[in-house]
Amino acid sequence: MKFIDFPTPKGLTVTVNTDQVCQIFHDHSLTDAPALLDFASGEPQGVTDSVADAGKRLGIPLAELDGFSPTGSQIGTVLVVPAQVTFVRETEPGRPDAGSLIHLGNGRTRAVTQSRKDAVDRIMAAAAKDPDA
């Protein structure tokens, strides 16, 4: 299991579990041009024209994309392929000590942690207990 960090346009950092699949990220001010990211490789796979276009490129109908949009979030909307995407995001810019552990496998589970390291440790511990989780 490997985690990578990437900055967002609003100055936050998102830490992603690269064992998981694909995610479409866009800032609220750029809803017509989300970035399509493939976290299996950890490299951006290109910018799409829209969320629907991103789903089309992934071969997934828009209706089957799971969504998560934290209230008041500064990082915008995250749309994920419904297949366990686990990531950690800072709750405030420049505050990596204030992280949230968010598991988007069901689009709902969310737990606030003490830090991004703490969140990563929790993910690793959960994976060790249940490799299929």
What are these regions (language model features)?
Residues 1-133:
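Eukaryotic intrinsically disordered, low-complexity regulatory linkers and tails enriched in Ser/Thr/Pro
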